[in-house]
Amino acid sequence: MSVLEESRPFAQQLSNVYFTILSLFCFKLFVKISLAILSHFYIVKGNRKEAARIAAEFYGVSQGQGSWADRSPLHEAASQGRLLALRTLLSQGYNVNAVTIDHVTPLHEACLGDHVACARTLLEAGANANAITIDGVTPLFNACSQGSASCAELLLEYGAKAQLESCFPSPTHEAASKGHHECLDILIAWGIDVDQDIPHLGTPLYVACMSQQFHCIWKLLYAGADVHKGKYWDTPLHAAAQQPSTEIVNLLLEFGADINAKNTDLLRPVDLATSNSAVERILLQHEATPSSLCQLCRLCIRNYIGRQRFHLIPQLQLPTLLQNFLQYR
């Protein structure tokens, strides 16, 4: 009994220590959560300077480092295309890779504004061509979003990745959806996968069909995009059938789109077309009319050659007329 009585105070002290540690941990967690909520409130209200002050004071993040910094004069000069001011700021020692609270760099701003000279100056000063914002946006994405082929080419020359993982916003899909076929041309020339499938978007061809961007659809198909790959079980023809463009539907059919393909609802493209529309009539007519032997042969030969070797078609010992036919020229 005496041993138990002596050990009891120690057990109580030990439990008190654990309780104190737990209390301190909970208090610290509460303070951090409160500060995070407060910072978010200031950000939403547009007071990023106050958010930066909180971060610097409580998290030990220096505002000079730029991680939580507001837009710098360099950001402003880049976004407005003021080249002379940009060069002056760089000569004064401003960080070329300074980021805002959203991790936007001056290069992001220059590309978003299609300011090629500013973008070149930043890249020559050491700007990161693959900088990523908190939303996963790169300078190349901004360039393709604005249709700036010059900025896109410049970024790629300075090491920008033409294609990132599927979890990041895709410059290819952005260019295809907005009809910026010149940017798409450049990306294709730099070796992108024209069939890159992003789960919530589908392939670039599917996106282009949804947005009715004929020139981008043509560029993708000419580059060898798979006419059957869309979004999940929906093919590009499913997407085009829901739109009014007969030109796009005819183009897809010419490149071998399967008129009998079914999506997850077991619906064919013709089932999705507006009743009594021109698109529905074309699909029904194509369904009832067999493809010509020339068309079937062209599709068969192209499939056999493969997308990676389309550029070798001119080397085949064939008449120029047949070469052009195989290349849809």
Swiss-Prot record:
InterPro entries noted in UniProt: Ankyrin-SOCS_box_domain, Ankyrin_rpt, Ankyrin_rpt-contain_sf, ASB5_SOCS, SOCS_box, SOCS_box-like_dom_sf
Key word Repeat present: yes
Presence of keyword Repeat: yes
One Pfam family it belongs to: Ank_2
Domain of life: Eukaryota
Keywords linked to the UniProt accession: ANK repeat, Repeat, Ubl conjugation pathway
SUPFAM superfamilies (UniProt xref): Ankyrin repeat, SOCS box-like
Gene Ontology process terms (BP): intracellular signal transduction; protein ubiquitination
Pathway(s) per entry: Protein modification; protein ubiquitination
The SOCS box domain, residue ranges: 278-329
Disulphide-bridged cysteine pairs: none
Ranges of the ANK repeats in the UniProt entry: 69-98, 102-131, 135-164, 167-196, 200-229, 232-261
Record text about domains: The SOCS box domain mediates the interaction with the Elongin BC complex, an adapter module in different E3 ubiquitin-protein ligase complexes.
Described purpose of this protein according to its UniProt entry: May be a substrate-recognition component of a SCF-like ECS (Elongin-Cullin-SOCS-box protein) E3 ubiquitin-protein ligase complex which mediates the ubiquitination and subsequent proteasomal degradation of target proteins. May play a role in the initiation of arteriogenesis.
Family statement: Belongs to the ankyrin SOCS box (ASB) family.
The protein's name: Ankyrin repeat and SOCS box protein 5
Species this chain originates from: Mus musculus
Gene: Asb5
